Amino acid sequence: MLSFLDNSSDEYLVGATYNKLYYVNPSHTVYDITPSGLTSGNLNGSLNLGYGGGFYGHDNYGSAPTSSGVYAEATTWSLDTWGEYLLACSSKDGKIYEWQLNTGVVAAQVSNAPVSNKGIVVTEERFVFALGAGGNPRKVAWCDQENNTSWTASATNQAGDFELQTTGQIMSGLRMRGRTLILTDNDAHVATYSGAPFVYGFERVGTACGLSSRKGAVAIDEGAFWMGKRGFFTFDGSVAKEINCEVSDYVFDDLNQSQISKVYAVHNSQHSEIWWFYPSGTSNENDRYVALDYKEGHWSTGELDRTAGVDSGVFTNPIWADASGNLYNQETGYTHGSTKPYAESGSISIGNGDSIMKVTQLIPDEKTQGQVEVTFKTRFYPNDTESTHGAFTLTNPTDVRFQGRQVRIKVQGTGNDNWRSGVMRIEASAGGRR
C-alpha cells in the first residue's frame, strides 16, 4: 500500500494484490489500474516439493522430496512516487509501470526500463533504482536523473548500474536522508550519491542481518527498522545492528516459515511504533503482530489480521488492510466488544531474586480512577506454578497482601473507556530467603 498527495494536494491511496493494482479515492470508489498483460503472481508462498526440487541425490529417484531448499515467495509490490505519478513493480512480473493519475487509463510500462526486476525505490536525488535488475539478484540499475526512460549509461547522462558484493539476493530498498539503504536476505548496503562519473557509491553496513520479506522493512526519520530471519535490526545511518527483543522466541518459534514472504512492516507515528504483521502457526495469512516502541524501547504482541498498511499523514489515521481486502481506519475510537485490552509486565524481583518480596499496598496512577483493574501473579521459583492475586478494583491507595520472589502485574480495562495508566508503585518489603 502507498498513500500520497498529487500536486493539487488531492489524496491518493494505492493497494495491490498478487495479480491486481488498485486506486481508492477519498470517496471509497475503487479503480482497477492493473497494467495490461501483467504476469499473475503467487497468492501464497510455497516450497518446491515436486520432481527435481531440493538437493541432487538427497531423495529417491522419481519421488517428490519431503523438503526443499527452493522457495517460491508470495508476490509483493514495490510502490513509490515519481513526482506526483505512481511507480509500481510486481516481484513476479518484474516490469516497472507508471500511472499518471488518470482513472480511465491503467498503469503503463516505463519505456526502456529493465525487466525481470524484484522491486524499485526512488532515491532522494530523483533516480529510479531497479532492484534485482534484469533478473540478476545482486544488481542495482538506475535511470538518468529526472528521466525514468533513459537507462543506458553514456557520457551525457547519469544512468548506470552496480552489482553488490553479496552472497544474498536484493530484497528491498529504502529511501533515507542522504542515502538509500539496500537490504538483501543476508546483509545491508548503503548507496550514496557522488555525482559523475560513478554517480553512486555502495558500501556494506551490516552482515548477518538479512531481511525476512520484501515488505518487512520501514524507514523513518530515526532510521530504518526491519525483521530478519531470527531477529530485528535497525540502521541509524552508520551501521546495522540487532535490536534487543524480549519476545523474539515467541515470534519466531511460531512464525509460519512457508509464508514468511508476507511479513509486512508499518510505521505508526502517532505512538512512535513499528508494527510487523506476520502469519503464525499454519496460517497462510498474517494473523499476529509484534510492535516496537522505538522511543521507549519496549515490545508488544497480539493477534490481528492485517496484511498491509500506511501511516497517517496523507490521511488523518493509519489505514490498514486485511486478507479479504477490507480497509480500516486504525486508531479510531476505543470500543472493543467483549475483548478487554490489557498491559502486562515482566517479572519484578528484589535484587537478584534471593529475597521474598512481601507486598502490602498498591498506589495506582490512572487517568480516571475505576477504569482499570489490577491482577498480580507471583512465583517463589522460576519454574514454579504462578499464583494469581486479584483482580483488585483500585482505590487510592489499594490494600493488597501477597508474597513471592517474582511478581508480575497485569492492568486491564473494565469497560469501553479510553483508559490510561501511568507508573504504578507498590509498597513492598524484603522477607527472608525461604
Please report, for each region that a protein language model flagged, where it lies by residue.
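Hydrophobic or amphipathic alpha-helical targeting/insertion segments
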Residues: 82-108
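Conserved beta-strand positions in repeat-built beta-propeller and related beta-rich domains
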Residues: 14-17, 88-91, 130-133, 182-184, ...
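Beta-propeller and closely related beta-pinwheel folds
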Residues: 37, 41, 59-72, 103-262, ...
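Hydrophobic alpha-helical hairpins/lids featuring a short glycine-rich hinge
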Residues: 80-83, 88-89, 123-129
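Conserved hydrophobic/aromatic positions in well-ordered beta-strands
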Residues: 22, 87, 97, 129, ...
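Beta-sheet repeat architectures centered on beta-propellers
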Residues: 2-34, 38, 51-60, 76-81, ...
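Short beta-strand segments and strand-loop junctions that repeat across beta-rich extracellular domains
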Residues: 20-26, 97-101, 134-155, 190-193, ...
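Conserved loop/turn motif of beta-propeller repeat scaffolds
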Residues: 9-10, 83, 125, 177
